[in-house]
Amino acid sequence: SELAICGYPIRDLDRLMSFYLAAKNAGRYLVIDIKQAYLLKLFSGSANFSKLYPSPKDEAIKIFIPRGSWGLLDKDMKVFSERQLYMDYAEWQREFLDYPNKVDYRDVSKNQKDFVFYCSDFNLQNLIDIKPNPGSSYVRSLTEPFDVEMELKEELIKNWFEHFGVISKERD
């Protein structure tokens, strides 16, 4: 009933498709990472693979625009120019700033019930701005840890989600 957060390997387009279909069937948008949007764009432009995956402009997909390195995303554009905003992103990312289905943390935060939000282990800081509501959920579709380093990483991720009240502090 609140924000649904999902995690899976960023280049695993089959898992992306699973979450895409689940979000669509639930009447929600799948919010994907800008890198995933780029991958979908490449497949959409391919003669052989264009029908395998949805276009990054698909009506059931939203593209999450993170803060750039200067953090101008939510700043007053009367003070900063549009050119400066675009320069805050890598060249390959800039085209997605003009997509009609782009969203940023403000959109996700305001309309949490409308989204299944992809959040990789490397972008957990986006949760600081989004502030998941109580009752939000997390589905982790990743390999179970099989060494100490992976166990430590999983513990770190659990701590983030516990902090935001997405998962319970009770542990096995």
Question: Which positions does each model-derived feature cover?
Answer:
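Acidic/His-rich, metal-assisted hydrolase cores and their charged scaffolds
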Residues: 1-172
